[in-house]
A protein has these predicted regions:
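Extracellular N-terminal segment of 7TM GPCRs
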Residues: 1-31, 69, 74, 78, ...
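Class A GPCR helix-loop hinge within the 7TM core
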Residues: 100-138
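Intracellular effector-coupling site of seven-transmembrane GPCRs
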Residues: 53, 184-233
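Extracellular-loop-to-transmembrane junctions of the mid-late helices
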Residues: 145-184
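Extracellular TM2-ECL1-early TM3 structural module of rhodopsin-like
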Residues: 7-16, 43-111
Length: 295
């Protein structure tokens, strides 16, 4: 059972460390998003929702995970591998927060995908149809749906793994369909612009701006896919045989990858959005100058 000790040690230290990284990174990104003026309002609101979910992951859920794995490590060091001694209330609270925040992220990313699809498809009509009020209603609906989804996971323990797998599969499918459609629409409009030269300058600029925004959202989705994809087979394998220690290790490792996604998103924002990168540089310089003045 030394494997459990080693895994618990790694996950405890890693979750504590990345909890700090995730929290600081998303606090800086949230500040930058509020100050950014070049990002479309609807995209900004959706990314703010995603960043707040990631902040909740780092500030609460991942920190709790580090504590739980530290407790597991402590009990394992005493040659006690009975994990049922862990407080059920704490475990359920951790799982609830984990699935609430992850469901919110999944639904927000799906919304971003379809928002970008509407943007590249509708062009100038997009602002008329996709209003800030409607985006706000969607974000409230996402919070309520995430709340209910997390409750289902907690109160249906015998089938919660399958619920998680189904939700992930549906999310993967919808986002993939949206981005494939975005690619086709962008390709079609590119051919129009290059072959006809009949589009008005304003419409051409808007099409190019929405195409760039769609590509930026695609990178966020790609990072999400890399971090979440291993979780699906690990859940299925663990559901088939809960007594196999290797399946349990795979599941815990895939959970850490999901947490890692919340640390990587701020990096993607900085990479893909020049204004966010500049605001963050300015903020960090101010913090460093303040630190120098204090010393």
């Amino acid at each position: 059972m030394s494997v459990i000790r080693e895994l618990s040690s790694f996950l405890s230290v890693s979750n504590f460390a990345f909890s700090l990284v995730t929290s600081l990174g998303n606090i800086l990104v949230i500040r930058a998003l509020f100050k950014a003026s070049s990002i479309p309002a609807n995209v900004k609101n959706l990314f703010l929702s995603l960043a707040f979910s990631d902040l909740g992951v780092g500030f609460v859920s991942q920190l709790m995970a580090g504590i739980i794995f530290a407790v597991i490590l402590n009990t394992a060091s005493k040659e006690d591998y009975n994990l049922t001694s862990l407080c059920p209330t704490v475990i359920n609270l951790w799982l609830y927060l984990f699935y609430f925040l992850r469901a919110a992220s999944l639904l927000t990313l799906t919304t971003i995908a379809f928002d970008r699809l509407l943007a590249v498809s509708l062009h100038l009509r997009y602002q008329e149809l996709v209003t800030s009020k409607r985006v706000t209603i969607v974000l409230i609906s996402i919070s309520l749906t995430s709340f209910i989804t997390a409750l289902i996971y907690i109160f249906l323990p015998k089938s919660n793994q399958m619920v998680a797998a189904v939700i992930l599969l549906v999310g993967y499918f919808l986002k993939t369909v949206a981005y494939v459609r975005i690619y086709k629409v962008v390709k079609y409009h590119q051919n129009q612009i290059y072959s006809q030269n009949q589009l008005r300058n304003a419409e051409t600029r808007e099409a190019l701006r929405q195409r760039k925004s769609a590509y930026n959202a695609l990178f966020v989705y790609f990072v999400f896919l890399v971090c979440y994809l291993p979780f699906l087979p690990s859940v299925i394998l663990y559901f088939i045989n809960t007594s196999d220690i290797s399946f349990l290790i795979a599941k815990f490792s895939s959970l850490f990858l999901i947490y890692l996604n919340s640390s990587l998103n701020p990096i993607v924002y900085c990479w893909r959005y020049r204004e966010i990168r500049q605001i963050l540089k300015s903020t960090i310089k101010k913090i460093l100058r303040l630190d120098e003045n204090m010393t």
